[in-house]
Regions:
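Histidine phosphotransfer helical core of two-component systems
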Residues: 2-41, 61
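Acidic ATP/Mg2+-coordinating residue in the GHKL
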Residues: 143
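Short alpha-helical Gxxx[C/S/T] motif in the catalytic ATP-binding
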Residues: 171, 175
Length: 210
């Protein structure tokens, strides 16, 4: 990746010249190289996001209980500034899914929900697993943030559309692509009492016996 040498060169430049400059110019150098490093990091993130969006993945489908997948990923968010409140199903919710791809979906949705709730007095994300009226396995993730803008509600799954100042705008399009490859669907909405919701419906895995 040609971006990595740029990032390393900026860091090396700052390290080599810092002690050779007076304080004023050292600060200018530090700010400039810091800007380069941060912008290169943002570009690398965007390149990786575009790669995930553009490539045709090779999925390995296995039987999973969505309850368990959600539990596993939520463990990574324990102790954070945002409180996650799980409301999982009291019975297994079987799906056929690629483990890595589905964890990527869950991470993206949970991370976005937590970031969107940061401005709330007590940031909270409610995560529920159950079934919808069609009998599909349903994941619902709602936060107590300010909700989606009108533009996001209409164009969230279009590449490069984002509410976040540092977002790539490729997270939700990648999520939608993965969900559709699993035969599911995803939708966004705002709650009447405030906050945003993401709903993902996936085909229920029905095992047949010969």
């Amino acid at each position: 990746n040609p971006l990595t040498p740029i990032q390393l060169s900026a860091e090396r430049l700052a390290w080599k010249l810092h002690d050779k400059l007076d304080e004023q110019h050292a600060q200018i150098l530090s700010r400039s190289t810091d800007t380069i490093v941060k912008q290169v990091a943002a570009l690398k993130e965007m390149v990786e996001a575009f790669r995930n969006y553009a490539r045709a993945p090779s999925l390995n489908f296995e039987k999973h209980d969505l309850n368990r997948l959600v539990e596993e990923v939520l463990l990574l968010y324990e102790g954070g500034a945002c409180r996650f409140v799980p409301n999982l199903s009291d019975k297994p919710q079987p799906i056929s899914a690629d483990t890595t791809a589905m964890r990527q979906v869950l991470h993206n949705i949970f991370k976005n929900a937590a970031e969107a709730a940061e401005e709330a007095e007590v940031p909270q994300v409610n995560v529920s697993v159950g079934e919808d009226n069609d009998g599909q396995v349903l994941l619902t993730v709602c936060n107590n943030g300010k909700g989606f803008s009108k533009e996001m509600l209409h164009n969230a799954f279009e590449p490069y559309v984002t509410d976040k100042p540092t977002g790539t705008g490729l997270g939700l399009p990648v999520v939608k692509k993965i969900i559709e490859e699993h035969g599911g669907r995803i939708s966004l909405s705002n709650q009447n009492e405030g906050g945003a919701c993401v709903k993902i419906a996936l085909p229920r895995l029905v095992e047949t016996y010969a």
